[in-house]
Amino acid sequence: MISNLTVIDPRAKIGANVEIGPFTTIAGDVEIGEGTWIGSNVTIMDGALLRGPIALCDGAVVKMGAKIYGGTTVGVKCTVGGEIKNSILQGYSNKAHDGYLGNSVIGAWCNLGADTNCSNMKNTMGEIKVWNYKAKDFINSRQQFCGVFMGDYTKTAISTKLNSGTSIGLGCNIFQADFPSKYVSSFSWGEEKFELEGLHRMNQRMKVLKGEEYTVEERKALEDNYESEL
């Protein structure tokens, strides 16, 4: 069902079994594949290609020329661009620029800098090892395709390169010139520890950008996790 409160450019191509919520705007030269679900107040800019099934949650923004493949969920108020395949972005996160993200799970309130690229397959095409938090070691995922697992409130700098099967914790800031470790512990600032008040300030700024409040409960949850990492 397509709401009669949407604005859809007549040049847009909408596939079968597509649902579109109210107050959504779809620009020209957009292609939306079969089985796609689009919430309310979503903006899809010119030239975006969406190969369903895909879910775009309320308030999401799809940038010009984005290429999004099936199996992808874009959370509430996320902004996405570049190329994304078979990935989940939880609410309020951004992957707004060129770069590849595949077979990945991105937490809430994350920001991937321009040209951040995630490998989801080894050069050897073999099975990928991932970090096991219980064993505190890498184990075989038995998956040929596996991207990055990123905790809430984590950010990457421009041109960041992430290896296949990388696990990144909460509240990290990734800006190494080379590949970071395949396991990055929570609250990492490059190779050092992120100062908690600095993390709070950064989170507050992003909350303002998304029109949301940085609650006492969120601060406390991060502080509790920070203490457990010491």
Placement of each model-derived feature along the sequence:
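Glycine-rich hexapeptide-repeat left-handed beta-helix
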Residues: 34, 39-40, 46, 61-66, ...
